[in-house]
Amino acid sequence: MIGLIGKKLGMMRVFLNDGTAIPVTAIKVEPNYVVYIKSSETDGYNAIQVGSIPLKQSRFKKPMVGHFKKANLTPLKYLKEFRVDDVSSFALGQELGVDIFSPGELVDIVGRSKGRGFTGTMKRWDFGGFPKSHGHRYHRAVGSVGNRTDPGRVWKSKRMAGRHGNETIRVQALVVVDVLKDKGIILVNGSVPGHKDGIVYIEKSHIAFRKKAQRKQDRLSFIPSNLLRQEV
């Protein structure tokens, strides 16, 4: 599924024709370029490598500089590979923009969640904790982590305290509310992983054929694009 590299700007709200307010996330998409093309004949599958946001050449090692020169591009900070059905419509150095998406389309977005540091089980796993009564001293403790003789150890994947957040998360079947081509901005319904100015990857949804996703798509009737342009 073809996709783009973007930057999360933040959240706002827009109004549907019936007056319902819906939350949307604004994603800024700088010009994306095709850096490398993989085909089923040479690599076993079809895919394109997309890059975005230029950086100084001195920040890259020579093999990477040569990698970009093959596509006649300056070195780019972010790279992402997207699977495609057919590579014949792409060329090295080709520029990709927000116009590959259209309002009402379903997309998947991948980003890194906000890092929370080392947290306990109540914040990390939403544990209920112990009673808040007087005389109790285990209010926010973990509690039991296993049996005694059998198995005599802590099971793998046991929910315990640890580093919270900063994980790669995919949010599926978000509806594209509007595409502002002149500003390079995509508005999607709902929240997107990560903090403001965080890098996200947008691609056409893998579950668009499911009935639940289709109902979500049909539920929204969007306001005219010219009204959205006044708010962004």
Curated annotation (Swiss-Prot):
InterPro entries: Ribosomal_uL3, Ribosomal_uL3_bac/org-type, Ribosomal_uL3_CS, Transl_B-barrel_sf. Pfam families: Ribosomal_L3. One of its GO terms (biological process) is translation. One of its GO terms (cellular component) is cytosolic large ribosomal subunit. GO terms for molecular function: rRNA binding; structural constituent of ribosome. It comes from the Bacteria. Keywords: Ribonucleoprotein, Ribosomal protein, RNA-binding, rRNA-binding. Belongs to the universal ribosomal protein uL3 family. One of the primary rRNA binding proteins, it binds directly near the 3'-end of the 23S rRNA, where it nucleates assembly of the 50S subunit. Part of the 50S ribosomal subunit. Forms a cluster with proteins L14 and L19. NCBIfam families: L3_bact. This is Large ribosomal subunit protein uL3. It comes from Hydrogenobaculum sp. (strain Y04AAS1).
